[in-house]
Amino acid sequence: MAPLTILVTSTTAQSVVILGGGPAGLAAAYRLTHLGYRVTIVDQRPLFGGARISEDLRDTLEPFTILGCHHATQALLHSLHSHSQQPAEAEIPLEFRLHDGSLVHFPRTSFPAPLHTWTNLLRFSGIPWKERWRLASWVEQLWEGDERLPADLEQRTADEWLASIGQSEQTRCVVWNPLARWLTGNDLSTMSADAFVTSMRPLFLSTRSDSRISVVQDSFQTCFVQPITETLTQVGATIWRNTDATQLRYERDCISGVLLRDGSLLQADWYVTALPPQQLTPLLPERWLTRYAYFEQLAELLSGDSTILHVHAEQPCATPRLILLNDTSFHSVLATAATPDRTGFSLITTDSQFAQDQPDSNLDIALSELLRSLGLLRPESRIASTRRRTIPGAILSLRPGTKLHRPIQRSPIANLLVAGSWTDTGWPPNLESAIVSGNRCADAIALR
């Protein structure tokens, strides 16, 4: 047997090994380097960012949305770019497609909180007037303390609970389910009512600035991954791509090293796993899985892939738009200007049939029909290109009971932290949750 190669990450300062180069791992690495730690980040993919891709996306535009309530995401974005080089953002309204094919905007008023929430709800024509008034009255009673949320929301589905407060099947289908799918990737019929309320509250029941929806014209790679990677390189962090971790070694309930596929052992003072739960559990010692409920409950977490179809059409885009959909496999469509004479459409789905990256003329036809029905694709325009990007494990199932199984960042192992959008952050599993979890891991290390 070949001798075991031991790689020690630092001898002059406390060191941290981070497994996973997705948003959570990158956020933790960036924060830790600013706190003076020596960081080694390991990822099994050729590119950081967490996508299942082989091409280099650094020069590819992939617009994405950021909500005003995503404070950690906004703070990281501003930290990575000087004031003059901040990525271009444009505020956009939220649109819904009704059963008759018409589109309605969710209104935004300039009233202070919480009056703006109540006024916006009453003005929203996507919900029948009687249901609007009933819901607005109920929300007002919550504010005044005359009504309380039920204690069993985590044990009930969102669909059942919304029906119990007077929201009709049609309203749930055209308004609440599209919102739930856009914010969490989950359907009302499968997610818990608590997860639904948690995802809605920051955007609709907070300040007016928190309800702002902005589209960033660039890509996540350009806005986050590239500048973080450049910063890590400049401060001397060690970056290992295309590298598999196979086991976490331990001594006396502390991590003693990470065994890599090539047989070498990576050692540090601290360890942060920023991996999906299904990739984390195979690395753990068997005795931990049976001894600690913290690790045992990871098996209860179920996740699925998310696929984004990037479609370019030969027509200009006057203004960006975001439309939430129903009665289709696609959750939403975001329209932005790819170039002055080209429009880019980003369609999100969790349907696995769209994850296969192969030519499909039927798909192009279906996409053209969908975009034309929304008034986004002109009759004389055609689709010039279609590209897919699949993010594995991006959607965590928020079925009833899941909240109890999402772990906090501090594990029962003294020098092991756990990061990821799927951990317990108070957010649904999204970019904000990933960044918050990475920040918390870094802060937990700094405070010990």
Q: Could you describe each region identified by the protein language model?
A:
Residues 73-74, 78, 84-193:
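Mobile amphipathic helical/loop "lid" adjacent to a hydrophobic cofactor/ligand pocket
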